[in-house]
A protein has these predicted regions:
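Short beta-strand/turn micro-motifs at beta-sheet edges
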Residues: 93-96, 198-200, 249-256
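Active-site "cap" helix and flanking loop/linker of ATP-utilizing ligase/carboxylase catalytic domains
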Residues: 123-149, 165-241
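Short beta-strand-to-loop capping motifs
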Residues: 35-36, 73-75, 213-215, 268-270
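Generic long, charged, amphipathic alpha-helical segments
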Residues: 227-265
Length: 296
């Protein structure tokens, strides 16, 4: 009764769209958005109940409208350095339709911005991250050292923070780390030693596109006709200039098998975004088996 009344009060408090999410880690698949994943207050309450069977609390908050971007920063406790921004596409199907996933693909541009943003928004994200790093030290007395991967959204009222992860993004790391010209060991050492401010991190001026090859049943509800199509054998042909990053796969005596999650990250790197996309799309087409991907 208590949870029902509390959730009901929050749901009726929102005049416009809102979202419901887990108060915890769910691999990027726990958020449901009004208008996309549910439409009525009854459906919203049903999802709240489901969340509360797995977690002690549920998040109900305003839905923000805008373009999202990922900014993976490195921090030595005092200095925060941003890597080129990336846009991740979490929805399972073309045109950003269907359920959220851990990420079906991502891209970055050769100018180290994105088509809908400038360096101004990158700087705003970096400033927010710097303030968070300072707040961590102020509140805990400890210097945070490592990756601060922020999810941001550009709204009509400016750049807003959605979340932080203390790790690289998946798939966003596959867009950025191949472009890093500075020795990554030197970067890690500078983070440990607190000397990141002395290191000039350099990235190639290249565009990247990452597309995930996934089982046909990946991310689908149990009642979907393809939901049971998960683990299966796959064969990989000539991928040309693309890079492959193996994820949820199992090498057996008779070949390579997908498991139930994202199988292979296929990355194209080129001077332009369109060429990088062409490389990735051509390569993912030679992965044979019951696989799916986002051709867009």
């Amino acid at each position: 009764i208590i949870w029902y009344n509390s959730c009901l009060a929050m749901l009726f408090w929102f005049e416009y769209y809102f979202f419901i999410g887990f108060d915890g880690l769910t691999g990027g698949k726990g958020v449901m958005v009004q208008g996309d994943h549910f439409h009525t207050k009854e459906e919203a309450l049903a999802y709240c109940k489901r969340v509360l069977t797995e977690h002690p609390s549920v998040i109900i908050d305003e839905r923000l409208e805008g373009e999202e971007f990922s900014l993976q920063c490195l921090c030595d406790g005092k200095t925060v350095v941003a890597t080129p921004p990336v846009q991740d596409h979490k929805r399972r199907f073309v045109d950003d339709k269907g359920p959220n996933t851990g990420g079906m693909g991502s891209y970055s541009c050769e100018d180290h911005a994105l088509p809908f943003m400038t360096q101004k928004e990158v700087t705003e994200g970096l400033v927010i991250t710097q303030k968070v790093a300072e707040a961590i030290h102020k509140e805990t007395g400890e210097y945070y050292k490592g990756v601060m991967y922020g999810g941001f959204i550009i709204t009509k009222s400016g750049v807003k923070l959605l979340e932080y992860n203390a790790r690289f993004g998946d798939p966003e790391a596959m867009n950025i780390l191949p472009l890093l010209k500075t020795d990554f060991v030197d970067v890690c050492k500078a983070i440990i030693d607190g000397t990141l401010h002395t290191l000039n991190m350099d990235f190639e001026k290249k565009a990247t596109v990452c597309k995930y090859a996934v089982p046909k049943g990946y991310g689908l509800p149990k009642d979907h006709p393809d939901a049971q199509s998960t683990s299966a054998k796959i064969e990989i042909g000539n991928v040309g200039a693309a890079r492959l990053y193996y994820a949820s796969v199992d090498k057996r005596e008779d070949g390579l098998y997908m498991s139930t999650s994202r199988a292979i990250g296929v990355v194209g790197i080129a001077d332009t975004l369109s060429e990088a996309e062409r490389i990735a799309e051509k390569a993912i087409a030679v992965i044979k088996g019951p696989v799916d991907h986002r051709p867009d």
